[in-house]
Every structure is written in structure tokens, then in C-alpha cells.
Amino acid sequence: MEQGLLHLYWGDGKGKTTAAMGLALRALGSGKRVVIVQFLKGGNSGEIPLLAQLGAEIYRGKAGQKFVFQMTPEEKAATRELQNQNLAAAIAQPADLLILDEAGSAEELDMVDVDLLKKAVLERPAGCECVLTAHAPPQWLLDAADYSTEMKCHRHPYQKGIKARKGIEY
């Protein structure tokens, strides 16, 4: 059995989730079992139905559609509970590839139990490849990563007032 490595895609640039989902597609195309947790994301995103159709196990959502900074304490508690339930369910599944999208942001915003997240990452089965995305990852993730790729934004259409486009940004 090959050793599963830890990938970290992080920074303020576009492409972190895109890179992670591209790897999911590659793994599924190679017959691998893929489990994805999308922290703090709800709504429609074009890749999710296709990845599910191809066999990925996907856990996502939040309590409501607000950003965390807009949530009431009750909504934050419900969202945190949902994130922890999703992560616990995901790590109970057999996986060749585990993707934890926005895990760093979930930790930074106290929307996931850090001990559970560390267990998912640091105590995963030996052959399980793991991918995390984050804006500003905690030091323990930077230290643990086998691959650490920083996505840096130099220019983005949003800066010109161009909104996210279906099929491109989501």
C-alpha cells in the first residue's frame, strides 16, 4: 500500500478548491474512493453533482445561508455542530482520497472541533491521500503538509466588480 500524503492548497488566490476537485476527478477516474467535506459551503456549485454522480461521497452545508460573521450565536452553534457531524461521518467512510475543503477557515472561525480535524488529518489510514484548503492555515497544517502550495492573488475580476460566474467560479 502506498503512503498517503498531505496536500495543502492555501492563500488568498483563486484555485484552491478547483485544484482539490481536479484531484478528486483524477482519483475517481482511476477507480479510487473519494470522500469530500466542504466546510461552510452551501448553495449550488457546478462540480458537486458531477462528482457525486461519479461516486464521490460528499458532505457539505451550513445552518442557513449567511456568512459566519453575520450569524447569530445560535446559528454559529448549529453550523459548528453540522460541520463536526459532517467531518465525523466522512472519516468513518473508507477513502483513498479525503478532501477537506475550507478546513483551515473552519478552524480559524471556530466552526469545527480542532481535535476532530487533527484526528482526520494526522490519524487517517496510511494509504489515504488528504487534501486541505485554507486561506491562512494554522501552523500545525503547514508543518504537517507534504505538499504546500500557496495561491497568491495578483489580479481578480471581482476587483473590477465582476461577480462570480456559474460554471467558472462556482
Question: Where are the predicted features?
Answer:
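Conserved P-loop
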Residues: 2-93
